Amino acid sequence: MATSIPIRNRAKHTGSPRSRAKSNVAVVGGRIDLPWGVALRELTCIADHRGSLVELDRHSWHPDDVSVQWTLSRSAPDVLRGPHLHKQHADRLVVLDGELLIGLVDLRRDSATARLRSSFVLAPLHVLTIPPGVLHAFFSQTATTALNGTSHEFDPADDLEVRFDDPDLGLVWPTGAPLLSPRDDDAPTLTVLLERCTAAGLRVIDPPR
């Protein structure tokens, strides 16, 4: 079943010598259902007069899904990374500064949430885990710095792109002309991607008719 997440209000710093501050996840429509296997963990910020400390990851949180590569990205406003689909690796995304509009589509044929679409704003102090087979894209609402951990080292053959404005995706972005990489700008339609995945033996949903 899908995981349902409510909006959380942004907690304010109390000004005390030692406080635990949490930020919000702004969810489109008030609540959001996440595809099966997608996880959102809220982090704790320990702050005092010296600064702050945040644990971003622990092996005990996901002992069977360890990140072997971490990548830092900085994005200008209106940058869209994706949509991408991975056959093998899982992503673990942390926003360090700014915020990202996240778009997800479950393309796994055997998933309990196949075809489910989700959209929400990811702010700091949360870790978003996305399993293989869930299409995802990240749009920078503001200048944004993010850290992405992956379960496998980067392999271009495992990074499949889709046109961001393909109506069959059902994902809506704040602008019709985002800043894209050349590879994302030349991406195929969802139908073409699904046909290629099926030909390669991957169990994905049927192409739209």
List where the protein language model places each region:
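Non-catalytic, conserved peripheral segments adjacent to functional cores
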Residues: A2-A123, T144, N148, H152-R209
